Amino acid sequence: MKQYVKTNKILLALLALCVLVSLAVIARRWQAEASNKRYDVVLDYSEMELLAEQSEHDVSWWLGQFRDMGITKVGLTEESLITLMENSPLAVTAIPMDTVIQDADWRSNYPDSFVQRIDRRGFDRFDVLVEVSGEEAIEFVTQGIQGRFDPDSYIIETMEAPYLPYSSLYPASSSDEDRAFLFLDGEVNDALYLSDTKYMTTMRKGFSQRNEIKASKLMYLSLGLMPEKVETIQELGMEIIPRTLAYDGHNDARFAQDVVRGYNAYGITPEYIIAGGEAVIGYDDEEDDFALNYFQDNDITVGLIETNVQRENIMQSGIEDIAKATDYNVVRVFSVWDYIQYRYAYYGYEGAEEIENTLYRAIVERNIRIIYFKPIKQNDNSYAYITDMDVYRDMFESLDRRLEAHNITRGEATVMDNVQVPSLAMLALGLGAGIGGVLLPATCLPMKKKWTLILAGAAAVCVAAAWVVMPNTFRLVASFASSVVFACLAAAFFLMAAKESSQVLPSNAKLGRILPRAAAILAVAVLLSLAGAMMTAAPLSSTDYMLELGIFRGVKLAQLAPLAFFCVLFLAYYGLFEKSRRANTLRLRDIVGALNWTIPVWVLVLLAAVGLAGYYYLARTGHETDVSVSTLEIIMRNDLENLLLARPRTKEFLVAFPCIMLAVYAAVRRLPFWTALFGLAGTIGLTSVCNTFMHIRTPLYLGFARTAYSLVLGLVVGAVFTGCFELLYRLFLIARKKYIEAEQK
């Protein structure tokens, strides 16, 4: 190793400078994260209504209970034709034209003048017919349509009571009330179908596929706030966070202006905007900045709703444009999805502990600053809510106590400062990745200093060219390259150090001499990986990545590549499990020997087991996987979260870090096969350290705490495991000696 350092000291010094640059970049991000320490809760009004229906109290009582807990904001979704039909006293019926025209006599069910206007205009199956009864309903619906739809996209016909001439197939109400009939012009992209609809034969075989239109986006388009609901919330002194559902193709400046008029009519200037549907209001009209000006003039924070797999955000039209235009005056929003609502009395808990754990992780680990809260449901009943207020009170009180350890409090949600990586710093980070890449082959190939420097110069030219030509892609490539390169360098270090240990210590050295050396090698290897983690995180340490408007790409490849490199390293240092190999360079005969190796059956079995373990390890990576974590492990994780500032990674402190110590032990004992096996498992831990910091949304202090806990626990577990392996090895030697003696008799 000394020779390696001496030969490459110039490049190693340059690499150290690049790491220092990464620390400077990381320091700016640290400051931004340190000031982002307040979260807020917004109640979902519609589900609060459903909760109230199943309890002995009305919705006003329930809202008041949450208000008394300090939760003062309520998300109120504007009404649409769908909500008016399904959950309001107003008499409204909306039907896709595809359904209407299936009745050959449909014209007789509507006023002649209305039908004639439709015929003159022309219609298709993507349109919608609406029937409204009652003065209040007519006023609400027609004002919403006239204010938010293009004048050329609808027909309205009103009929004063008594209304007798026609017998509608879909009567909205009695005939002694005024009625209105509306035709809404739809497009093919507005149509909504049921998935996988088909006719079946009596033999349960598919007969024909059906593509019946069951609804339209026009039926979900927001029309306005319901006055009674607004009054209920405002009488309690609570703040309304209006939610408007906007859809592409029906979301121009006219729509946005009418939405804002509706807000102003009730004196609502929202603190946050949590967009619904497909877009932020007004973002069909690229030439009109009305919506953006409204957000900026009123200092409104826009919510980025996290997806239900807890990765990235739901990217509605206009979200990213607004984020950039408002200097990232946005916050991440965690919606309590239905599968989380059901986690009451889950994993053996008695109450809402697992829901609390979910909220805790969202706030602490993923930069979530608004919880869009929906009431808890029973885990064995999809429709029954938990109606015990003490459950909610206890959950939020416990959550706030746990968040105190992170200096996070509840109140007006804080906004992340806009932090960007300076251009020259980005170049330095890319050069660091390039230099590290040049140092890798020098760990296992006989490269002279001159050729290493020439290769480094060529790498620098390529890096600089990429920095100029593709700056956006450059940051991702630099981050990915650093994650691979430094994990490989750390693996090379501990394998070099393990082999040197075998040359310094005798094969029968006492465990007391091996363990301190193994612990030191583990600590240095983890520090090298941590330096790589800084180089990995630094290029992406900007606000857009912290808010998951962009994410690290290539996680699985970054985990696999160092494992493959370790195999090459081992072949260079040990050949085919040679006990007394002196050279540390890869030779052609090593490769030929490996290709011609006759593998024993027991090795094949062991490799198959290792392969299955590797597949399980990779398959569990990320949220979108079918390989689930066991209940026992989840409970253990939750307990660690409660005890420690950050939960250490199980694979690090229970497997990978102890295996690095075992690899050193096996090297000293001249057990090259076990050095290879334990070393391969240990390399997983070094990639895991870098992987921890690939999650840019996670605050840095958690990554440092997690790695520190893993290292400390890994040292303890590693010492225990090494002691156990030493005992087994001694028993094996005794058994083998007795077997040989018995064979000689």
Give the ranges of each region predicted by the language model:
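Soluble extramembrane regions of membrane proteins in the secretory/endomembrane system
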Residues: 35-423
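Charged, low-complexity intrinsically disordered segments
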Residues: 29-42, 485-489
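Alpha-helical transmembrane segments of integral membrane proteins
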Residues: 2-28, 427, 431-745
